[in-house]
Structure formats: C-alpha cells, structure tokens
Amino acid sequence: MTIPNTIPITPELIAGHGLKPDEYQRILDLIGREPTFTELGIFSAMWNEHCSYKSSKKWLRTLPTKGPRVIQGPGENAGVVDIDDGDCVVFKMESHNHPSYIEPYQGAATGVGGILRDVFTMGARPIAAMNALRFGEPDHPKTRHLVSGVVSGVGGYGNSFGVPTVGGEVEFDARYNGNILVNAFAAGIAKSNAIFLSEAKGVGLPVVYLGAKTGRDGVGGATMASAEFDESIEEKRPTVQVGDPFTEKCLLEACLELMQTGAVIAIQDMGAAGLTCSAVEMGAKGDLGILLELDKVPVREERMTAYEMMLSESQERMLMVLQPEKEQEAKAIFVKWGLDFAIVGKTTDDLRFRVMHQGEEVANLPIKDLGDQAPEYDRPWRESGKQAPLPANLVAAPKDYGQALLQLVGSANQSSRRWVYEQYDTLIQGNSLQLPGGDAGVVRVDGHPSKALAFSSDVTPRYVEADPFEGGKQAVAECWRNITATGAEPLAATDNLNFGNPEKPEIMGQFVQAVKGIGEACRALDFPIVSGNVSLYNETNGVAILPTPTIAGVGLLPDWRKMARIGSANDGDKVIMIGVDGSHLGQSVYLRDVLDSREGPAPEVDLFAERRNGDFVRSVIRNGQATACHDISSGGLAVALAEMVMASDKGLAIDLGEGKGAPHALLFGEDQARYVLTVPADVADFLCANAEGAGVPFRRLGTVGGTALTVGDLISLPIQQLRDAHESWFPDFMEGRGELAAE
C-alpha cells in the first residue's frame, strides 16, 4: 500500500506554507514546473526566515567576525575560539521562542537540546549552558504557567544531559505577553586541531542518519517559527518537538567516540526543518548534490509521508558524510550506544537535491537555490525617532531613598533569581567556580591547573526600544563588562537577535540600527561575533515584543585563583567606584519601577571609556589587588552596592562626598562603563594614583564593615532587610501569594 505524495497545490496551500506569491513565482521560474507537495514543503522550510535569514543576511554581513583567536566564525553550527594550549571553546546561542510559548516544557527542553547538539556536532564536549528568558507581565494569566514550564524544561533537559547552567537572565514585560523569548546558550571544549564541519566533500560517499528515530513531532516547526501568532495558536501544538535528554547524552558520547576514528568527513545536527535543512546545508556548502532514499530512514510511526519525513523536527538526530571503509566500525559504535545508524543516501556531482520514496522521485531541486543562494531581501526600514533629553532635575527624587532601593531590589525585574537557578544543576561536572547571581558564570577548564572560562548573557530591551543603536552598543558593552568584572579577558560573542515583523519598516529599522550598534561596539572592544541566530516575527495580533538583541560572550581567565567575585570583600576594605558619577535617569529602572514612567533617551555608551575603564579594572584584578568587583548596570550604583552587600553578608558605609549632581542621579543613574571595586585599605591610595595616571575616572566611596548598607544620611538598611525584599518576590509570585505577586 503506497503512501500518497500527490496533493494539489492551491494558493491557500502556498500561503499556508508561508510563501508569498512572488516567492512561489520564483519557484516556478527556477524549476520550470509546478512543485510536488514535498518540494513545496522543502522550499517553505528552506526559504523561511528561520533557515534562510533572508531579511537579515544583508545586515549580518556587516558584523565583525574575525580576530586573532577566531578559528571558525558564523556559518557553521557554532563559533570556535582559541583558548591556548591547543584547546578551543565552541559556543552559540539560539532561540526557541515560538515553540516555548505553545508548549513551554518541551519547547524550552528541546531548545536546550538543540543548542547542545550544535556544540557537540563540532567535536566539543559541552561544559556550560546559559539561558536568557523573557516573559509577559507578572499578572498576565499565562505568565506563571509559562515561567514554571520553561524553567522546568530547561532544568529537566540540562540536568539530565549533565551540563551545568552557569548564568542567564529572566525578565518580565507586558510586551512579551503574547510572545515569550527562550534564548539558549551552550559552550563546549575541543582540541583546536579536531574541529568537525558540516561541508560535505567527495562524490559518491555515504550519507548516514544517526541517533533517534523520526516521528511526526515538529513537522513545520521552522515555518511556524517564521510567522506571527494569531488566535489559532493552540492548533500549533503538534508542531512542537519532544526531547529525550538521555538519548542525547548517548548521541554525544557516540559522536565524540566516532570522531576519534577518522570516519567523519562532515557532520550536521538535524534542527530546524530536520532532514531537509541538514542535507541541503551539507551539500550546498560543499558544492555537491545529495540523493536521499527515504525508505531507509528509521521511523517510529507508521505510514509517514515523504513530506512528513523531510520536515519532521524529531530531536536527537544527526546527518553525516562517512568514509566508506569505516562504515562497520562507525555502525558498531552507534549500535553499542543503542542508537540508529542508517545509510540513507549519497553525495552526487550534479548539484541536485533528489529525494526518493517508494521507488518514486518526490523531489528534484537545485541544491544551491535552496541553500546558500536562497532569496535575500533588502527590506525598507526607517530610523526610530529620538527620545527627548531628560535631565535629572526633571525627574522626581524619592521621598525615602531606602524605601526606593528596597522597592527596586524586590521588584519583578531586579529581585533574586534563586527560585529559577536552584532548579538547574549548576555544579555537575565539578568545574563551576562562579554560580548564577554574580556578574558572570565561571567554569574551570578540565585538565588545566589554572585556566577558566567566564560566560555572560546581556541585553537591556528598554534601551533598545528607546534607541536601537545605543541599545545594541550597550548589550555588547554590558556583556564585555560582566566578563571583565571577573578578571577575564573577553574573547568573542554570539548574538541572538529577537525582533518583531521585518515587513514593517519601523521594526526593520530597529533591527538595522541595533545591528549597527552591535557592530560598532564589537569592533571597538575587539569582541567579534562568531555565531548567532535571528528570530523575527515575534508579534501577536500586531503587537511586537521589545526589540531584544541578546549578546552572550565568553572570556578567558589564565589564573582563576586571581578571579574577582561580587561578594568576596573583607572588613576594612575600601570601596572605590571606577567611572563617572551617575547622572543618566532616562529609561532607568528607577524611573520605570519607582516613578512608573518610561521616558527619556537610553544612556549613551562611550566605547573608548568602556575599553579604558574595563582594561584598568581587569589589570587591578589580575594584579591581585581587588577583593571584590561588580559592574554597575540596571538600578545604578545603589543596586550594585546592595547586591554586593547581600552577596558578601558584610555592610558598607558609603559617603557620596563631593559627588556632583543630585543624589538620586548619583545613586540610581544608569551611566555606562562603571564598576565598584573593593581593595585592601593599604592598596587604595596606590590604586587611585594608578587610575589617575591612566586617565580613569574614579571616586572613593567608603569602607566595608558592619551589618547594614548606609549611604550618608539617605539610606540605612540592614543586610537582612535588603535580603528579605530581594529573595521574596519570585517565590511569592510563583506561589501566588497575595498582592505581592500582582504588583
């Protein structure tokens, strides 16, 4: 009994596949006939935003992607950066936004699984994960359910697979009510001379399917990820993939073992658009055709059509081009790990993508036009309007500074994330040196006495909305600053660019300006972008998310014994601020959460100052002079000091002294390129003299000691009172306790 592959191609079917009339006409011109149903599915998957980057490619090319340590930049499964001693770090961040809104547990879990596969496909063993999460406003009826499901999914997969979650972000805003963001990051370590790529080489070589069996889960997932949501969202539940972290753990071990044998010519994980995308990418990159025999694909459901097999996004699967003489050795490894191993095709020299099913050719398409020569758009865009200046004297000061600070540290967006990260295994593998809650996660490099890597993920969407160019710069600068605050040298970054509908010129303008800002900051800070992901159409019923270009970065610590933490100050240490006095209250959390206003421009990022101040701070830490360090970001100096007090369990006596400007601007201003350092009292004068000599602005703030944070006569808060406010919001919210949760 044959399975039908013939379905009439109607305008409704074409539109349902996300193809515009002009794109369908391009298909007709390209192949000179009507496509089969399977071919329509293949074009739909390969020409959508998720796989082709057709709206963003033009602008992504402007980003700096090279540097002395960059081994592999964008275009592969993940970026690769040299960390000395013949080792490299392999990392990437990507989104699983649309599936996680529809089915939060599986959407988030398979997001983690997908990014881990991207890393070990390259030959690297994963050593760290992070996730940047954005949810709707806390009192939206779906938010608590989504937070619970996503956090369980991230933890369930990462913990079972065995990778520590070392950092991330969780934020709430009404603009994410209809589209949450789940951006997952993973990093692994490999030998620099043993990196595996996806470019197929050689004609007539076997194309091998590895891993789990193919089912109907995730069919059309990539197409869904390239569309806006509307009222029919619940119908999309079947397009969410289902993950199994134990199978993935076996796949990791089998792949790394196979890579030792010299059998692998090219390897690609099956992610978006499954078998279609992995086969096309391998062939197109190597200027080769691919012939697939679907009757040989391992399936776990009956009567699957060619269309379903080609577009299934079942998890834990790989595609590989193999040295033919190593076939039996390779197969034995996968059988040992309980995984499928099937030769499902071969490479050809005709640049065609041909798919056979039940003896019939169901697809015969030009492979380059599906892959690296897919359509590309130069969409119309316009710049965002500038926000009017907002001098500090036009912003009301709080009646009670202590109360304002308690309100900030206990707010939805500034409170402790302990409830979240305690559900993640942060210590597995035994190399974690800094856990979530500080500036960056730090993980020791196995087999090396002193080397470690620092990881951070950052973006301030309210800044990007107010000024996409400065907001793009700030996301890069804050990531660079967080890594620097541990004493690490920032090496390279990965971007995850989440925006609304690019067909709207104002949204496309946000994207273009943010990418320009990211590029400028990366060039100024020698912080190249080596991998990334773009997620567009994050809109529901015409309401777009806040523009959210997440930047995740990696830094190198040659000696982790000289690393700085935010909570390691000693009694009697002196507190010194590096950078200018706070003055900028536009778009600050003080303005938003205390005064309920969202006005003013985003803070400007002076990249020269960012570099100068950061390099100075790093040298202080590496010279062993700093006992603690924390960067100043959302909430300004006051929140940074409060976080240090809570982390160290030691009070601070602060005197703003000669600070120029209004106290609320000094305390809550969100000016950039700033850090708080604590140093032994006998080092303070020396450090200040060095800062002066290097042209680095600084201010002596006070002394470590006592059991309270005091700032002149403005603030006097016992550590426990700060901690109670900081730690209570999240558990209260998740347990639905009273008014607190609805604030």
From Swiss-Prot:
Top EC class, one word: ligase
Presence of the UniProt keyword Amino-acid biosynthesis in the record: no
Keyword annotations of the record: ATP-binding, Cytoplasm, Ligase, Magnesium, Metal-binding, Nucleotide-binding, Purine biosynthesis
Subcellular location(s) of the protein: Cytoplasm
Top-rank lineage group of the source organism: Bacteria
Positions with a binding annotation for Mg(2+) 1: E94, N533
Gene Ontology biological process terms from the UniProt entry: 'de novo' IMP biosynthetic process
Positions that bind ATP: Y53, K92, D495, G532
E.C. number: 6.3.5.3
Binding site for Mg(2+) 2: D118, D269
Binding residues for substrate: S95, H96, N97, H98, R117, Q241, E313, S314, Q315, S535
GO molecular function: ATP binding; magnesium ion binding; phosphoribosylformylglycinamidine synthase activity
Main location group: cytoplasm
Active-site feature positions: H50, H96 (proton acceptor)
Catalytic activity: N(2)-formyl-N(1)-(5-phospho-beta-D-ribosyl)glycinamide + L-glutamine + ATP + H2O = 2-formamido-N(1)-(5-O-phospho-beta-D-ribosyl)acetamidine + L-glutamate + ADP + phosphate + H(+)
Signal peptide coordinates: none
InterPro entries: PRibForGlyAmidine_synth_PurL, PurL_linker, PurM-like_C_dom, PurM-like_C_sf, PurM-like_N, PurM-like_N_sf
Key word Magnesium present: yes
Role summary: Part of the phosphoribosylformylglycinamidine synthase complex involved in the purines biosynthetic pathway. Catalyzes the ATP-dependent conversion of formylglycinamide ribonucleotide (FGAR) and glutamine to yield formylglycinamidine ribonucleotide (FGAM) and glutamate. The FGAM synthase complex is composed of three subunits. PurQ produces an ammonia molecule by converting glutamine to glutamate. PurL transfers the ammonia molecule to FGAR to form FGAM in an ATP-dependent manner.
Family: Belongs to the FGAMS family.
Record-given protein name: Phosphoribosylformylglycinamidine synthase subunit PurL
The species this protein was found in: Rhizobium leguminosarum bv. trifolii (strain WSM2304)
